[in-house]
């Protein structure tokens, strides 16, 4: 799983038949932009949990769905600048 920030929606009206009409979002994963299928209805600025590989296809609706990154959750609170917690 990845923690990503949603940057903006991506509109693609000309798609292959199996791609259906699922919403797409541009997300920031570290320093790179990626396209993710939005399975939860997030908006720009949200921090989200994304899954990849076969989990992404299944989360998008089917193991045959052509996705390698799907948003599966919106994070309620995330401070990316907070220091890592150290277990004592």
Curated annotation (Swiss-Prot):
Task: Read off the InterPro entries from this record.
Answer: CsoS4A, EutN_CcmL, EutN_CcmL_sf
Q: Which residues form the signal peptide?
A: none
Q: Which domain of life is it from?
A: Bacteria
Tell me which UniProt keywords the record has, alphabetically. Bacterial microcompartment, Carbon dioxide fixation, Carboxysome, Photosynthesis
**Domain BMV as annotated: residue spans:** 1-76
Which Pfam families would you find in this protein's record?
EutN_CcmL
Does the entry annotate any disulfide bonds, and if so which pairs?
A: none
| Major place of residence | other
Q: Which PROSITE patterns has this protein been placed in?
A: BMV
Query: Where is it located?
Result: Carboxysome
Gene Ontology biological process: carbon fixation; photosynthesis
Q: Does the keyword Membrane apply?
A: no
Q: What does UniProt give as GO cellular component?
A: carboxysome
Role summary:
Probably forms vertices in the carboxysome, a polyhedral inclusion where RuBisCO (ribulose bisphosphate carboxylase, cbbL-cbbS) is sequestered. Has been modeled to induce curvature upon insertion into an otherwise flat hexagonal layer of major carboxysome subunits. Has not been identified in purified carboxysomes; it is expected to be present in very low amounts.
Family recorded in the similarity comment: Belongs to the CcmL/EutN family. CsoS4 subfamily.
* Oligomeric and partner information: Homopentamer.
**Record comment regarding domains:** The tight homopentamer forms a pore with an opening of about 3.5 Angstroms in diameter which is positively charged.
Protein name, as recorded: Carboxysome shell vertex protein CsoS4A
**Which organism does this record belong to?**
Prochlorococcus marinus subsp. pastoris (strain CCMP1986 / NIES-2087 / MED4)
Q: What is the lineage of its organism?
A: Bacteria, Bacillati, Cyanobacteriota, Cyanophyceae, Synechococcales
Give the gene that encodes this protein. csoS4A
């Amino acid at each position: 799983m990845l923690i990503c920030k949603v940057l903006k929606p991506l509109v693609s009206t000309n798609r292959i038949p199996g791609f259906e009409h699922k919403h797409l979002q541009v997300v920031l994963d570290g320093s790179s932009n990626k396209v993710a299928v939005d399975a939860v209805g997030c908006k720009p600025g949200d921090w989200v949990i994304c899954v990849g590989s076969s989990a992404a296809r299944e989360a998008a609706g089917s193991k045959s769905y052509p996705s390698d990154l799907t948003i599966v959750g919106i994070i309620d609170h995330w401070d990316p600048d907070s220091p890592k917690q150290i277990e004592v």
